[in-house]
Structures are given as C-alpha cells and as structure tokens.
Amino acid sequence: MRLLDSVAKEKIKLDKKDISIYLCGPTVYDDAHLGHARSSVCFDLLRRVLLANGNRVKFARNYTDIDDKILKKMAQSGQTLEEITEFYIKSYEEDMRVLNVLDPDFKPRATHYITAMLDLIKKLAKDGFVYTLEDGIYFDTSKDEKYLSLSNRNLEENISRLSNEVQKRNESDFVLWKFDENFYESEFGKGRPGWHTECVAMIDSIFENTLDIHAGGIDLLFPHHENEAAQCRCGCKRKLANIWLHNGFVKIDGEKMSKSLNNSFFIKDALKEFMGEALRFYLLSSHYRSHFNYSLSDLENAKKRLDKFYRLKKRLDLGEISDFDVLNDIEIKSEIAKQILEILNDDLNISKALALLDDFISSANLELDKESKNKILKQNIKEALSELAKIFGFGFMDTTLYFQWGVSKEEREEIEKLILERTEAKKNKDFNTADAIRERLSSKKITLLDTPNGTIWEKINA
C-alpha cells in the first residue's frame, strides 16, 4: 500500500506486516455529526484494505472525555461529567455500528490516562520546555526548533486558530495542564490536562513506539497535530508518526460543517431518512483527502448505486453476509476483489474502485442473462460480492430487509395484511379488488412482486 503523507506531500509505501494506526476521535459532549462519520468511515476503509492485504493492524480511536465543551455542557445541564460522556460515547458507538465501522482494538478515554499525561509534562518540565502562568502550565514552542515542521504553516496566517486568553510568551504556546480546583491532584497543582497533551499520552501508553499512521480531519493538522508532534518529539524523544493522513472537511452549502459553526448535520438526522450503508457509501464516494460537500441529491444517487449491488445479491438469492471474519485472516480469491484491492492500495483511490465495482455489477448481470442456470458462475459472483462487501464495508444486509428499509412495524403489518387480502381476491378471481390493493400500496410507495413462491414487497425510496 502507498499513502500520501500530509507532511512529506508524497506517497509513502507501507511495506511491513504489523501496522499501528491512531485516529483522533470525538469530544463527547453532543451527538456526532457527518464530519465525524466521514473521518471514521474513511479510515475504517483503510483498516479494511490493510486487513484484506493480510496485514496485522493495531487500531486505536480515542475519546476526549474531559474538555471545556464538556464542562460547559455540565453547567448547562446539571449532569456530571461521567453522565454526559457515557451517554455520548454510547450514542457515538451506536452510530458507528450502523455505519459498519469496525470496533477499534483500543478505545482510550483521556480520563483514564491522567497519570501518563502528568508523566509527560514532568519530562517536558525537566528539559525546560514548560513555564507557568496563572491559569496553567504551558509548552514553550520557541524551545522546539522543529515546531511547525509538521503543518508547514506560516504562524502569522493562523493566529485566529490559537487561544490567546492569557499573555503567553509566544502566541503559538499551548496549555499542558489547566489549573482547576475541581479536578486532579498533581505536583503542579490541581487541574486537568490540555487537549493536545491527551492524545500524546494515550498514544505513548498504547503503542510505545512511533506510530505507522496517525489519522484525523484536516482541521486537526494545526494546531492539534502540530502540538502533539512537538510534545512527542521533545518529551518522548521520538517522532510521533511515520505517516500523517488527513481527511477533508464535510461542507454544507460550501461551508465547513462543525458544531462550533452551528451548521452540524448529525449522523442520527441522516439515519432517519437513509440506512447506514447508504450513508457509508455516500461518505466514501469521494477521495478521503477531498473536501466533501453534502447534498441530498448526491446521497440519493449513492443509494441508487448501492441498490444495484443489492439487486445483484437478490438475483443470486444471496442473503446476509457476515462481517465477522474481517478482523481475522481473510483470503481474497476473486479476480475482481483483487483488482479493486490493488486500486485501493494506491492511496485509497475510491472513485476508481467504485467505478470498477459498477462495471463488475453490470457485467455480472449480463453474464447471468446469458447463462442463468450456470451454477459455477453464480457461485463465483456470490463469493466476489462477499469479498467486496468486506473490503468496502457495505452490502451485508439481507436483501429483503434492505429493500423494505424505512417501514415501521405497524406499517409492515398493514402491508402484509393487504397482501393476504389481495392473494385471496386473486384466488376468487376478484381482480378489481386485487388491482385496487396494488394501487393503494403503490400510493404508499410500496411495490409488489409476484413470484412462484408468493408475493413479496419493496419500499420505493426514490
């Protein structure tokens, strides 16, 4: 696999068996939005491709469970820190499951690594990289000769992204430990960690050595990732990561989507209208480094492309596909899966990979038209679809449930009742009643398919 490093601006080859990946996760004070979803889905694809390659992947995604935003939520709601963070961690993980994001090997929470954070600050203090102000302990960026080497930023152009609530030695200096009588004891005084320190301590505790890949949204490159790299370089005496990957912004109407800009589109909002697999397909449909402009029409088109995958599955009578063995050794045998894997190994070239998937589906349908009774052909296509599902992370659902998605239990019972009435009417040659029932269901966007095994129904989503 070759990946474009955000720092070197060139593709770097991953030529080792064991791969370590750390993805910056959410600050858990609210439901996750599509920006969080895209980051998780993009780097879940990376993980799946590596696993399909036969790599052993050690994957961590953290939770920031102590932060100014969480404290503000505490003040507004009257809830404890634990009540808020537990609720939103559970909410986030529910969203990830619906999006078919594989569970990380490690899900560190910042509050579980306070001792490690204090140890890191002590190392930095010992070597003269810190100073004290009235509100906390700060990192002196002027003492780090390589500061800004990660983001290659001109500091003057990025002052607006920095915190300037106190008079620091340098505008780029950042807090390591915030004094706060409500939190943790330390030799520096009671307080809580700064955000940039949290990730470094968790990475050092879990991986111990330089990461192969550090991933996150492009908005984290500066100052968050720059400040992480500085602390690791100065405190741990090593490079934090060999490869840095950053996914592009999710935008709405051309504007970056974020909670701070009050234009978030929550994952749960999208999931009210579209199934998780359709949303996953959509979020994957442009290259991870590209900025992603959300549009309802594009999401609907992504759903139509995914429908074709499921139509082929249905034609083959291929039911639910298990995602269980993705985390274990999986062997890619089909030629199409090997070709798509080769494409994705070039910096996750998803557009080319999905185009090839579309071509494969069209070709498979043509072959089945010509050789509808060829059992070997059918089995080969089934195996290919199963392998492709595990690589892309979509296509696992039972086809009947897929095409009936979005129908409530009560609606389902009513539909089944009407189908039985229609069947009875047809038996009695009461075709006017049978046609009226079909029309009634059609008006509710339900289409009926009469088969030798009975009538089945689908929800029309377009």
UniProtKB/Swiss-Prot annotation:
GO terms for molecular function: ATP binding; cysteine-tRNA ligase activity; zinc ion binding. Its main location: cytoplasm. It comes from the Bacteria. Its EC number is 6.1.1.16. One of its GO terms (biological process) is cysteinyl-tRNA aminoacylation. It catalyses: tRNA(Cys) + L-cysteine + ATP = L-cysteinyl-tRNA(Cys) + AMP + diphosphate. Its cofactor is Zn(2+). GO terms for cellular component: cytosol. It is found in: Cytoplasm. Zn(2+) binds at residues 24, 199, 224, 228. A motif ('HIGH' region) lies at residues 26-36. Monomer. This is Cysteine--tRNA ligase.
